[in-house]
Structure formats: C-alpha cells, structure tokens
Amino acid sequence: MLLRNLVAEFLGTAMLLATVVGSGILLHKIDAGNVAVTVIGIAFATGCVLYALIQMLGSLSAHFNPVVTLVNALQRNIRWISVAPYIAAQVLGAMAGVILANLMFDGSPISISTTERHGTGQLLGEFIATFGLIGVIFGTSRNKPDAVPQSVSLYVAGAILFTSSTCFANPAVTISRMLTSTICGIRPTDVPAYIGIQLMGGLTALLFFSWLYNANAKDSQSATAAPGDTDLPKTLKAPHAFVLPDDYNIHEQERELTGAK
C-alpha cells in the first residue's frame, strides 16, 4: 500500500509541474511581452489540472507538497516514518515533471534558472500563499470534506494571481523549478529563503487554524453539553486526498519501510 501511495505522489507531482512549466513555456511564446497573460494562463491550467489530479489520485494519496505532508504528520494523520519517503517521491516527481516540460518544448532536459525571485514582498507573498493553502485544506476538510478538491484547486489558481510570488507554496515545486531557464524558473540562490518561508507559513497556519477550530468546537460543545460534561468532540480527519485512507494499516506501513516481515 505504501508503495502505491508513493507512486501516486510521484505521478501527481510530476503532472502538476509539467502543467505549470509547460503552460508557462507555451503562453510566454505568444504573450507578446505581456507577462500577465502568461500568469493568468498558468493559473487557469494549474487549477484545472490540480483538481483533476486530486480527484484521480485522492483515494491513494494526493499531498503533492512536503508542507502538506509535514502538517499531516504533526496532526498524527500519518506516521513520521512515512514523511521522508513521501517528500522524496514529491521532489523526484516534481523534477521529472519539469524535465518533461522542458523536453516537450524542445528545450534541454535541465537548464538551471537565472530568474531572480527575492525581496521582502515576494517572501511575504509566499508566506501568505502557503498559510492560505494549509488553511483551506484544514478548514474545508472539517466543514465540507467533499469540497476539498474544488477548494484547493480554486485557491491555488487564485493565489497564483494575487500573490507577488505567484504562489509556489510548495518546497518540491520550488526545488524543481530551479531546473528550467524559462519564465517559471527560480534562481538556485533564492530557493532556501522560499522553502524557509513556506515552512513558516505552513506551521503558522497549523497553529492558527488548530486554535480557531478547536475554539469553535469548544464553544459549540459548551452550548449543548450536559453539566459536568467537558469532553470535546474528536477532531475530524481530513479527506483521503490529504491523509492516508482510513483502512490503511499503519503497522504494515512501518514493515514496508523497514523490510520487516
């Protein structure tokens, strides 16, 4: 089961990055110098394909993002022993997607980017983008789990347009986009700051929305509970798109990772 989850993460992240970079390359050829046209097209293509990928692979695993994986581990939705394999699959998949996009448009498989992405404004944009992404996943998975694919894909499409950084919001995306010298690239020296601010945004979102929804649950419970009943309702799990399926044997996962029988 773990192997299939990792393959799903690899495939989904690869297709996501092929979409981002491929659409960027194509649209930049026809935008006549108007970069806004390219960004709008990337947002539309990314939102559409991300929705399809979550629907396609959600029954297995559809994090496609190390920050989402780390947040799930911190919430104890997945074992920490799974985190490294998940992140490795996501990063390798993202790199494969970028390479495929380069090749589709007759470029070199790998061409290191020189596109500068730095400064307070862009880092703030990345913090906001990642904070919002985790918030959308966290809140929608509790209020309307079936709407997570729509909510996440719409948010990402919108965040590409409204943030100064064009919403990387994903360390695997950031690392892989070093490998394309196109409009979608990022200079290697700018990558550490992007990843650091993404992790900060994700962790801040986890703390904030955990407080927000726990406080809401406590208020609701206090209004309806019998005197002396102080137990809070259990936190709802996120839908299968962002956590392991409910019937997954976590001990089987550990055996697969360690090679034990």
Language-model segments: residues:
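Membrane-interface helix-loop junctions and terminal tails of multi-pass membrane proteins
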Residues: M1-K261
